[in-house]
């Protein structure tokens, strides 16, 4: 295909000369980075697309499987595993011979011959292969370890239909009944073959067949019977990672003015690609595909195309050739991938949507709504790219982190500590329509947007952590982004049940309204504590309760079963909320066993982590221990999920009941033991208790003593509980500000020499729904109170800030609030939505579109509703509109400040702090437009005495002031003011150039999340105003 496409690859630039092609400029920071990469990467592999060639003959094939799917062919179901060998060869393994099955209890008195029954089923239902009778135990309820007979029904297809027939009583001589082990084909196969997500599989040499008539683009394509697979548990040498190829890409579109790009109309003009191998730090492919010419970029290839169609087809060829295992990017799932597919469709490129690993499978876009209690509801687009894993960093970060803003800019600033230039989509078209130099600028911008997701992937360890989560829970990697928490527990449950001959009932998920009491919170004794507060934490509280008391489906009793099995009180535990569970000597529960294995494996991973020296292996082990911890904690949540596969409120409510009891017991034990009557100099006091921790005031002033006592108290109280429940001493807060339940701040100490950090919970330093001023003020106030121990200084700072706010001295960037403009209908009018509508009426070209974040400030208007008072910050700057400072004081600052100062100063003094004499002076900017000003006729006045000037006087002064000799001083002041403003603007402009990575190019950035953007805009306006004033001085005759 490639020879027919008119493309040119620009020559690699001379790396020694650090100049652009026009010789005008030094390279930007980002280009220096590209240069470093080029010099660091081995020459022979740099910019090489192809995978390493295959050896002439194979022995055993071992590969790490990445993606798995089931497929149907001529009435049979099979599985496909895609993977990569240690040498970097791509593999497609077709697994044959496995037949899906489910269980159904054999009815009492079943006297039919099994062969007759099987023949009847085969004649009635399409797809039945065979039926066996086997002895199993149901997971639900203690059964005295007695197994009962079950039909094991094997079906090549139509398994859901057959299962429903048994459940609905459509099978001859069998009443409606519960069926067991309802799980999809792929997971059933993986569980039975002991394959976990991202694990290694070996295909023995004489067991697999090489497929010559290949359906995939993989280097090795083979078939094997499932019984011949060798699956390696992820431990020891099999914890390794294959050299996965990770492609990060970004596209740029040339949109029309005022319209967000639409694939039917707006072309894709550039695609930047960066490919890196997992475990390596430098990408070995860096290129940009462009429409039209483009000047060269250091250390990167440019592929120029005359037509967009040629560029897209060449990019598709690039994907097939470089053969990425993982495709990443930022918002690629909902924008970039669907956009290129829709654009190719609009251009009639029928051969384009085939860049997966299956040659004849077309890439198609589906809409999916993902909803879970943990992650909320999100609408996403899903594209099948068979054999290639997709990891959209935006979706990953939205799932794992709570941030103020999720733009790539904000996220990069938060995690990587660097900003990037943010070019508005309307400017992109101007750059594309300019010269090859402006297109080069766009290409550098696009390439950086492809680099950043790779940097985030490395920093946040997404691939490593998700790999370990797939290995620990057993599910395919793709499930981790597309499914909720439950599937992970189900997978572990089925694996353990298979070992123990236990089957799991297929219960209808009905979502009961039954509620159970949550965790205890000991009422906080609010206040400011200038003494050390020790924190005692239960290690893995809920998992350890389930293990200590053997809480499980398989150990659950009721009064009838206690009587039927002749159990005594020594045989079972009665939980605080009145449920019964048998002791582990009679039956060790499945859930406690799973938890025991997870926590033991975590201890081992943490021990290995301490010994490991290789940085990549350390990351893998850290990801593993994290995955094990998360998995252990999610088992409890699974039992309490009323809309779930296997809800059991007896387990979940017993866990929280034990938890409540233990927090109370800890409080009483500590206060009883560390008391004056027990020979201690102070009475210890538990000032707050949360789900799994208690805060203790021992009374001592010095940190070291409190740390020793904390350690001692944790060990002492642990002896009062059943194994493996353990109380641990982790930290001391000193000083500590306890505001309310789940709201506190303090300095966090783990060693007496120096505090580790300032720790806050539920306080506005971490809240996302307020302006930057609140965050900055609260952070500063806490620094003064906690780090400097200087409350009067904090009070002075607050008074000064409030005075500055009321007198219009706070920079506008501090007052900007941003919210996402989404398509959902809001029940009440929203400030940012109403503003977006007003902006559209003013200028459709610059108005926010769906998906954008709308930045606004609250201004003084005739209306009293906030949605009437929201305004675009740029419009406010241009027209000098007055800010509603009372809104910012009353609605944004007052409550957070009250929460901090009332525990310290009391209500009266806090009120004085927020409403004292420093709040009497209010200055408001005079608007330039609107209201009566529309009818006012503006006349020029003398800059000295404010006397109106005659029409023919275009100068700055009236004749009287000229006669009095005021000119020179006033002119000098005007010049020095101009000098100050130009200097300020120049500093801000340089800061923006430094951020964009070049000190010579014009600043195009319009990042509304960045405070400098508004400062720069205001400074530019101030310089312009002052220049107009100086023109008047030029026209003054003096």
Curated annotation (Swiss-Prot):
[4Fe-4S] cluster binds at residues 992, 995, 1005, 1010. The keyword Metal-binding applies. Its EC number is 2.7.7.7. Coiled coil: none annotated. SUPFAM superfamilies: DNA/RNA polymerases, Ribonuclease H-like. InterPro entries: DNA-dir_DNA_pol_B (IPR006172), DNA-dir_DNA_pol_B_CS (IPR017964), DNA-dir_DNA_pol_B_exonuc (IPR006133), DNA-dir_DNA_pol_B_multi_dom (IPR006134), DNA/RNA_pol_sf (IPR043502), DNA_pol_B_thumb (IPR042087), DNA_pol_palm_dom_sf (IPR023211), DNA_pol_type-B (IPR050240). Binds 1 [4Fe-4S] cluster. GO terms for biological process: base-excision repair, gap-filling; DNA replication proofreading; DNA replication, removal of RNA primer; double-strand break repair via nonhomologous end joining; nucleotide-excision repair, DNA gap filling; RNA-templated DNA biosynthetic process. It holds the Pfam family DNA_pol_B. Zn(2+) binds at residues 942, 945, 958, 961. PROSITE patterns: DNA_POLYMERASE_B. Its cofactor is [4Fe-4S] cluster. The CysB motif binds 1 4Fe-4S cluster and is required for the formation of polymerase complexes. In eukaryotes there are five DNA polymerases: alpha, beta, gamma, delta, and epsilon which are responsible for different reactions of DNA synthesis. Heterodimer with subunits of 125 kDa and 50 kDa. The 125 kDa subunit contains the polymerase active site and most likely the active site for the 3'-5' exonuclease activity. This is DNA polymerase delta catalytic subunit. It comes from Candida albicans.
